[in-house]
Amino acid sequence: CKKMVGAYFEGELCADACLKFKGKMCPTARTSPPSRPSSTSLSSRCCSIKSLCKA
C-alpha cells in the first residue's frame, strides 16, 4: 500500500494513515499533523484507495 500511494500522494500522508489504521480511517483536517496542509480533496483521494489498504 505505501509503495503504491507514496509516489502519488504528496508527503505520503495517505500511505502512512492507510498502514496505521489498516484502511479503516481517512486522514482529515482533524487527524492530519498541523505542519502539513490538509484539504477535503486530499481526504477524498485517500478514501478512494481505502479498499487497497485492507489487504
Curated annotation (Swiss-Prot):
GO molecular-function terms, A-Z: ecdysis-triggering hormone activity
UniProt key word Calcium: no
Highest taxon of the lineage: Eukaryota
Gene Ontology cellular component annotations, sorted alphabetically: extracellular region
A Gene Ontology biological process term: ecdysis, chitin-based cuticle
Location in or out of the cell: Secreted
Biological role: Neuropeptide that triggers the performance of ecdysis behaviors at the end of a molt. It triggers adult behavior patterns: larval, pupal and adult ecdysis, and plasticization during the molt.
This protein's name: Eclosion hormone
Gene source species: Romalea microptera (Eastern lubber grasshopper)
